[in-house]
């Protein structure tokens, strides 16, 4: 967070947008939507070696408690309505990370009749993490990119 001015009396001045976005970046609560082998790498990122908790990322079991959805793996046509329903149950503001080649564009199963060719056809995606499967470091980098995107957004509507 960039602080515009620090006065000699001990006051800190900043904008409400930057303060709100700073608090949001420090408390991302993802709901895991693990569909295939990418979910294993997502579990590695949450474990002790990579420790997403140090970035304020706490995995939540319910969509009503989370503000980030990590779609990891192959999205089938039958699973697409459930993905959209879970996304709609999340509170605003909400963000989506698409993890892996299958979630990004169908991956290895791109030409299969039963696979959605990218979860961005169902829900709006904010960050794409490439790889098959992407490493836990790639997911950590994706979370950092999402935090940077949140810092750049305007929270309060301006006329």
UniProtKB/Swiss-Prot annotation:
Entry's transmembrane regions: none
Gene Ontology BP terms: aerobic respiration; electron transport coupled proton transport
Keywords: 4Fe-4S, Cell inner membrane, Cell membrane, Iron, Iron-sulfur, Membrane, Metal-binding, NAD, Quinone, Translocase, Transport, Ubiquinone
EC number: 7.1.1.-
Entry note: cofactor: Binds 1 [4Fe-4S] cluster.
Topological relation to the membrane, as annotated: Peripheral membrane protein
Cofactor(s) required, per the database record: [4Fe-4S] cluster
An MF annotation (GO) of this entry: iron ion binding
The keyword tRNA processing belongs to this UniProt entry's keyword annotation: no
Record-linked SUPFAM superfamilies: HydA/Nqo6-like
The keyword Lipoprotein is annotated on this UniProt entry: no
Top-level taxon of the source organism: Bacteria
Residues annotated to bind [4Fe-4S] cluster: 37-38, 102, 132
Family matches, as InterPro entries: NADH_UbQ_OxRdtase-like_20kDa, NADH_UQ_OxRdtase_20Kd_su
GO-annotated cellular components: plasma membrane; respiratory chain complex I
Signal sequence, renumbered to the chain: none
Enzyme class, spelled out: translocase
Pfam families named in the record: Oxidored_q6
Compartment list: Cell inner membrane
Catalytic activity annotation: a quinone + NADH + 5 H(+)(in) = a quinol + NAD(+) + 4 H(+)(out)
Record text on subunit structure and interactions: NDH-1 is composed of 14 different subunits. Subunits NuoB, C, D, E, F, and G constitute the peripheral sector of the complex.
Family named by the database record: Belongs to the complex I 20 kDa subunit family.
Stated role: NDH-1 shuttles electrons from NADH, via FMN and iron-sulfur (Fe-S) centers, to quinones in the respiratory chain. Couples the redox reaction to proton translocation (for every two electrons transferred, four hydrogen ions are translocated across the cytoplasmic membrane), and thus conserves the redox energy in a proton gradient.
Protein name, UniProt field: NADH-quinone oxidoreductase subunit B
Organism of this sequence: Burkholderia multivorans (strain ATCC 17616 / 249)
């Amino acid at each position: 967070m960039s602080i515009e001015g620090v006065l000699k009396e001990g006051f800190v001045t900043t904008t409400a947008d930057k303060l709100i976005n700073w608090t949001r970046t420090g408390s991302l609560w993802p709901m895991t939507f693990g569909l295939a082998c990418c979910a294993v790498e997502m579990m590695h990122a949450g474990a002790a070696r990579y420790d997403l908790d140090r970035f304020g990322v706490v995995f939540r079991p319910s969509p009503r408690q989370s503000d980030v959805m990590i779609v990891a793996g192959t999205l089938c046509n039958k699973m697409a309505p459930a993905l959209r329903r879970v996304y709609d149950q999340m509170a605003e503001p909400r963000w989506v990370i698409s993890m892996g080649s299958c979630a990004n564009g169908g991956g290895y199963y791109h030409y299969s009749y039963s696979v959605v060719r990218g979860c961005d056809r169902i829900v709006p995606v904010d960050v794409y993490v490439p790889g098959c499967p992407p490493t836990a470091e790639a997911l950590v980098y994706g979370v950092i990119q999402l935090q940077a995107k949140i810092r750049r957004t305007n929270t309060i509507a301006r006329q």
